[in-house]
UniProtKB/Swiss-Prot annotation:
Keyword Transmembrane helix in annotation: yes
Transmembrane segments: 310-330
Positions with biased composition (Basic and acidic residues): 168-208
Domain of life: Eukaryota
Alphabetical keyword list: Coiled coil, Endoplasmic reticulum, ER-Golgi transport, Golgi apparatus, Membrane, Protein transport, Transmembrane, Transmembrane helix, Transport
Localization terms from the record: Endoplasmic reticulum membrane; Golgi apparatus membrane
SUPFAM superfamilies per the UniProt record, alphabetical: SNARE fusion complex
Organism of origin: Pongo abelii
Phylogenetic lineage: Eukaryota, Metazoa, Chordata, Craniata, Vertebrata
Protein name, per record: Syntaxin-18
Length: 335
């Protein structure tokens, strides 16, 4: 049984805060001002990324704890008939499947969003590597929780198939109903006789005439318990047919079990490939953004080169015109 340790946790947090505050005062009382400023600025890297990453890890951990807590009731197809505690209906199991899939999809989108923002922000190489490692760890944690959910779902589907197979193999209740109706008739006859006692006193001969055929049929029924050879052969053929049907059902169940296991394995592979494709799409997006920025810079350089080339042409034309005028002036002066 879980124990509430909230008060102990709060006391521990308060003790740690007091100790850190005391250490901060001791460091701040030093002579070196630059050292004091360094210690003051040290908590600055704790930003939005760390809090959001911790939040995603907390959500994934809650999902894992929830799946493990309700594992027995979730995978047990007979929990609603075995005990009143831990009862879970198929509707609740379907709701758990739907909520878990939505939750895992949301966590995956949050991880990809954190990865995109980490690539966009300008940080040192060490910070980028640290954030990439943190996101890889969170993604691996999510994959393990997805694998746990896939295994539980495969076990549940397998047990549901077994339950349906067993329900198909239950005997038909025709003989039981016939026996119950005959016993009810026999039990009701004394009560009717007791209720209709005044009428029977008036007509005893008629009642005896009615009861004698009933006793005769009862004795005939006892004699009919012995089966003839034709009936025995017919029942043996029916038994052989039922055995063949059960064997075919067992074979079908084994095939379905193999297919369910294969589907769960393919689902795990599909989930892993989808996460890999999301990471590749994100990296392609980053490359496209970088290529777009490079194209913009190249266009700016081309514009600057065109402007510089135009100015250079103007100076060349000016030089040629001045040279022409100088030659004309010298020719006129010489003549």
């Amino acid at each position: 049984m879980a124990v509430d340790i909230t008060l102990l946790f709060r006391a521990s947090v308060k003790t740690v805060k007091t100790r850190n505050k005391a250490l901060g005062v001791a460091v701040g009382g030093g002579v070196d001002g630059s050292r004091d400023e360094l210690f003051r600025r040290s908590p600055r890297p704790k930003g939005d990324f760390s809090s959001r990453a911790r939040e995603v890890i907390s959500h994934i951990g809650k999902l894992r704890d929830f799946l493990l807590e309700h594992r027995k009731d979730y995978i047990n197809a007979y929990s609603h008939t075995m005990s009143e505690y831990g009862r879970m209906t198929d509707t609740e199991r379907d709701q758990i499947d739907q909520d878990a899939q939505i939750f895992m999809r949301t966590c995956s989108e949050a991880i990809q969003q954190l990865r995109t923002e980490a690539h966009k922000e300008i940080h040192s190489q060490q910070v980028k590597e640290h954030r990439t490692a943190v996101l890889d760890f969170i993604e691996d944690y999510l994959k393990r929780v997805c694998k746990l959910y896939s295994e539980q779902r495969a076990i549940r589907v397998k047990r549901v198939v077994d339950k349906k197979r067993l329900s198909k193999l239950e005997p038909e209740p025709n003989t039981k109903t016939r026996e119950s109706t005959s016993s009810e008739k026999v039990s009701r006859s004394p009560s009717k006789d007791s209720e209709e006692n005044p009428a029977t006193e008036e007509r005893p001969e008629k009642i005896l005439a009615e009861t004698q055929p009933e006793l005769g049929t009862w004795g005939d029924g006892k004699g009919e318990d012995e089966l003839s050879p034709e009936e025995i052969q017919m029942f043996e053929q029916e038994n052989q047919r039922l055995i063949g049907e059960m064997n075919s059902l067992f074979d079908e169940v084994r095939q379905i079990e193999g297919r369910v296991v294969e589907i769960s394995r393919l689902q795990e592979i599909f989930t892993e490939k989808v996460l890999q494709q999301e990471a590749e799409i994100d990296s392609i997006h980053q490359l496209v953004v970088g290529a777009t920025e490079n194209i913009k810079e190249g266009n700016e350089d081309i514009r600057e080169a065109i402007k510089n080339n135009a100015g250079f042409r103007v100076w060349i034309l000016f030089f040629l015109v001045m040279c022409s005028f100088s030659l004309l002036f010298l020719d006129w002066y010489d003549s």
